[in-house]
């Protein structure tokens, strides 16, 4: 009897202590995924004639310095999406671009098609280029443009959510990589550019550089103001809701008058 009493004496406090332990609450719901339109940016709604010029695939040893000279003459800041392999060969050009107020973005190490690669391979392309940019200019890029604009939805999410990049596409494409001639490159840019546009070009093609003097002058004449992509994103304003169409009140249709029957 004494043994049972001793066992009960130790058991009761243990049961009380267990009962006083806080029970695990329900699991916190995971935050909803970021909508695709907030992960990738092709253009923005702005109050004002602001646009962003972007140049891909450099730096080019001969052409990028010529472009930088021209941009300096016009007091224009642009955004350069650079290739890691090219940075490794010419870090001094990237350093000059950053020093003169241009923005440097990540455009992969060797320009592969992300959508055809494993996630690990994509991460490697991005991180290697990130390290090359950081080594050249002393700061980490925050913008990324996937080569060809090709990237899967899953890749978009980990590039944005895990790696911390804004994914930048474009809404003006002069197809300058096809080298259609400087005049055509210029006319396409002038025709398609609107306030909030992100203009795609490549500073590795001579025709693109040849098209820029007339293009920049005409864009200035049209009243456009040039900013980097990050500056353009900061100028973003909500898109106003569409104006509802006026609803016309239905017109009452008069009832037909029935002639009295002759038969009464």
Model-predicted segments: where are they?
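Terminal accessory/targeting
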Residues: 1-52, 69-79, 195-264
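Residue-identity detector for glycine
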Residues: 6, 25, 48, 58, ...
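Alpha-helical protein-protein interaction elements
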Residues: 10, 47, 73, 99-101, ...
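Active-site beta->alpha N-cap acidic-glycine motif
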Residues: 28-125, 132-135, 139, 234
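Hydrophobic/aromatic residues located in beta-strands of well-ordered beta-sheets
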Residues: 78, 104, 142-144, 167, ...
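Catalytic domains of cell-wall/extracellular-matrix polysaccharide-remodeling enzymes
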Residues: 88-89, 112-240
């Amino acid at each position: 009897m004494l043994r049972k009493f001793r066992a009960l004496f130790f058991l009761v406090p243990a049961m009380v202590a267990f009962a006083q332990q806080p029970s695990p609450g329900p699991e916190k719901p995971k935050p909803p995924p970021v909508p695709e339109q907030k992960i990738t940016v092709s253009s923005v709604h702005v109050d004002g004639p602001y646009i962003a010029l972007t140049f891909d695939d450099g730096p080019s040893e001969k052409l990028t310095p010529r472009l930088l000279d021209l941009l300096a003459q016009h007091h224009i800041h642009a955004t350069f999406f650079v290739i890691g392999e090219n940075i490794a060969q010419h870090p001094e050009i990237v350093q000059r671009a950053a020093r003169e107020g241009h923005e440097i973005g990540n455009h992969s190490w060797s320009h592969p098609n992300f959508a055809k690669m494993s996630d690990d391979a994509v991460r490697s392309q991005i991180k290697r280029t990130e390290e090359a940019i950081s080594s050249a200019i002393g700061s980490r890029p925050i913008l990324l443009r996937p080569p060809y604009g090709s990237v899967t939805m899953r890749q978009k999410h980990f590039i944005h959510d895990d790696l911390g990049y804004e994914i930048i596409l474009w809404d003006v494409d002069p197809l300058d990589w096809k080298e259609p001639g400087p005049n055509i490159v210029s006319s396409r840019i002038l025709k398609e550019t609107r306030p909030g546009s992100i203009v795609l070009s490549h500073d590795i093609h001579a025709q693109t550089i040849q098209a820029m003097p007339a293009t920049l002058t005409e864009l200035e004449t049209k009243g456009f103001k040039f900013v980097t992509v990050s500056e353009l994103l900061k100028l973003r304003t909500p898109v106003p809701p569409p104006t509802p169409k006026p609803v016309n009140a239905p017109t009452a249709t008069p009832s037909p008058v029935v002639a009295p029957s002759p038969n009464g």
